[in-house]
Amino acid sequence: MNRDSFYPAIACFPLLLMLAGCAPMHETRQALSQQTPAAQVDTALPTALKMVGQTXQWWLEYHDNQLTSLINNALQNAPDMQVAEQRIQLAEAQAKAVATQDGPQIDFSADMERQKMSAEGLMGPFALNDPAAGTTGPWYTNGTFGLTAGWHLDIWGKNRAEVTARLGTVKARAAEREQTRQLLAGSVARLYWEWQTQAALNTVLQQIEKEQNTIIATDRQLYQNGITSSVEGVETDINASKTRQQLNDVAGKMKIIEARLSALTNNQTKSLKLKPVALPKVASQLPDELGYSLLARRADLQAAHWYVESSLSTIDAAKAAFYPDINLMAFLQQDALHLSDLFRHSAQQMGVTAGLTLPIFDSGRLNANLDIAKAESNLSIASYNKAVVEAVNDVARAASQVQTLAEKNQHQAQIERDALRVVGLAQARFNAGIIAGSRVSEARIPALRERANGLLLQGQWLDASIQLTGALGGGYKR
């Protein structure tokens, strides 16, 4: 070994000795692996979430001002959104608190003490009153004031890892807020279109009741003229009573939906005044771009992903705790035994201290903390994998339901067209004077019944499509 390499080796020897003297790290747990869709999760949060909040407002595609207003009110006033927002602020404050530990600290302190010295103690000579010797005991009023500074050197990255873990939690909370936002918007939209479905059904039932009343009036006139018996109109009366009962049921459902919407929008002061609008048309098939790659837009997967990232940083921090801690301290103070001397230049004192803490034996505390961090990380990964599987199942189930209901709506549309042809034939025969007007009403009632069935199927498809939108994280576009 030449002289040029000998001295650097000697200089590094104390560092190697310190590292060798640290508490041993035990590898007792195997890290779990994440599901494949983890690679599809966008890691640009929370910026990406803010973009989703601005551009993926899927409810705007309905072009319904009432629905947009309800969802906006819910997002602004719902208690769930307020809770999610406070969780983000708490996580941000905790991250800032950890980040501040990585920088230098400077404090100012001052104290004054009045004390009587013991003549029999270690400071016994100061208990004497001998001005020639510099003692004026036994009473003294001493004072100290000045600056103290400290800096913990994060050589091994422990504090940086803790900050990264906290920032991961912040991003996870932001993703949870977006998930709450999507769930809230989906709940409001589903209730709103359920109300519109019931409102449309109410209109059809009123038309059925009108046709039934026409038949009842005709039967009564025929009975009064002695043309028919009273038995022939009984079935029509029963059907009319059933229709009125259905109307009452629909009105009750609409009131319940309005109450639930008021609760979601936190609107307890005034009743909702919704106006009926036409239901959106049923799409015959799912769009071509529908795929599991859209799962990356799900906010719950984003949140689970960031909890995993946070747990991995926590492991890094737990590992860094096995290495030595180095602290720098300095002070600049005025210290005097008598207050009258406190502000003299001779009362000034200063110093610099470098401290080293070497974890040699800790009874397994550091390894226990590392095991806890690894177990929590494995739990986060397992939760993420479970969320991925559930997300895939949610999409498959919702997509299948949407496709099935779309096919049912197509079949129902054909049934309604056939029923309308029967009504058209009856109307033509009435115009020709072959049948009475009540027979046209009798032909219209089955067609209206089929129309009511079609509205219910249309509402079910609409509800399923909103669920599919939620399963894809709000990124599915009809």
Curated annotation (Swiss-Prot):
Any GO molecular function: transmembrane transporter activity
Top-rank taxon, per record: Bacteria
Position of the signal peptide: 1-21
Record GO biological process: response to antibiotic; transmembrane transport
Cellular component terms (Gene Ontology): cell outer membrane; membrane
Coiled-coil region: none
Membrane topology: Lipid-anchor
InterPro entries per the UniProt record, alphabetical: OMF, OMP_efflux, RND_efflux_OM_lipoprot_NodT
Lipid attachment locations (S-diacylglycerol cysteine): C22
Subcellular location, record wording: Cell outer membrane
Presence of the UniProt keyword Coiled coil in the record: no
Lipid group attachment sites (N-palmitoyl cysteine): C22
Segments traversing the membrane: none
Pfam families given in the database record: OEP
Keywords: Antibiotic resistance, Cell outer membrane, Lipoprotein, Membrane, Palmitate, Signal, Transmembrane, Transmembrane beta strand
Keyword Lipoprotein: yes
Role, per record: Could be involved in resistance to puromycin, acriflavine and tetraphenylarsonium chloride.
NCBIfam families (UniProt xref): outer_NodT (TIGR01845), PRK11459.1 (NF008524)
Record family assignment: Belongs to the outer membrane factor (OMF) (TC 1.B.17) family.
Listed name of the protein: Putative multidrug resistance outer membrane protein MdtQ
Organism: Escherichia coli (strain K12)
